[in-house]
């Protein structure tokens, strides 16, 4: 088997840095979890785009007469939260679906609940916090309508992000509880060290893949094309 080479993030060749992670949905994730994993990845991408749009909104805020603090914080949130959200909550759920690890699920729940709270705060938009939320945007309409309209775009995106985050958290929690997962299982993985044992992880991944393939290849009940009836000659 060829060695897996890190391929994410896909950096341009002129940047003297190399990718930090290996990511291949089709190769790593069992088919029954593929759709959910990709949706969470798209949610991470939406979060990153929202932070970038928020930077533009805060620039319009600054040009319209707002303080420079919001623009500076918006830039900080972009360069800080984009990689941190990938490492802190997407990689754990990627690993959880890949290896069926209860510890990784718990790590995801813990960090993603923080992500949900942050998204709600961003949507609210407290002035001076570097986010174009509802309070900051609505209050700025009386100062500069043009800037406020631009600020409205990241405000809507923050709101969408908060709603989608709540839905995603509910769906993953429902799946985890339905599959028999629990906090005690995560504690057991932590105690035994199974969460960081590559052999255990590979065995769990192979078992998940095998279960998925078995479900898809399950033989169907065969029926005879021509029915065979036996009649009695006795009257």
Curated annotation (Swiss-Prot):
Q: Which Pfam families match?
A: SCAMP (PF04144)
One Gene Ontology BP term is: protein transport
Per the record, its GO cellular-component terms are: Golgi membrane; plasma membrane; recycling endosome membrane; synaptic vesicle membrane; trans-Golgi network membrane
Report whether Transport shows up as a keyword of the record: yes
Domain of life (superkingdom) = Eukaryota
Does Cell membrane appear among the keywords? yes
Q: Which residues lie on this side of the membrane: Extracellular?
A: 61-67, 126-148
Membrane-topology annotation of the record: Multi-pass membrane protein
Membrane-crossing residue ranges in chain numbering: 40-60, 68-88, 103-125, 149-169
- Where in the cell is the protein located? Cell membrane; Golgi apparatus membrane; Golgi apparatus, trans-Golgi network membrane; Recycling endosome membrane
Cytoplasmic topological domain ranges are 1-39, 89-102, 170-235
Kindly state which keywords UniProt assigns to this record, in alphabetical order: Cell membrane, Cytoplasmic vesicle, Endosome, Exocytosis, Golgi apparatus, Membrane, Protein transport, Synapse, Transmembrane, Transmembrane helix, Transport
Purpose of the protein: Required for the calcium-dependent exocytosis of signal sequence-containing cytokines such as CCL5. Probably acts in cooperation with the SNARE machinery.
Summarize subunit and interaction data from the UniProt record for this chain.
Answer: Interacts (via C-terminal part) with SYT1 and SYT2; interaction with synaptotagmins making a link with the SNARE molecules. Interacts with SLC9A7.
Concerning its family, UniProt says: Belongs to the SCAMP family. SCAMP5 subfamily.
Q: Which PANTHER family match?
A: SECRETORY CARRIER-ASSOCIATED MEMBRANE PROTEIN 5 (PTHR10687:SF5), SECRETORY CARRIER-ASSOCIATED MEMBRANE PROTEIN SCAMP (PTHR10687)
Protein's UniProt name: Secretory carrier-associated membrane protein 5
Upper classification of the source organism reads:
Eukaryota, Metazoa, Chordata, Craniata, Vertebrata
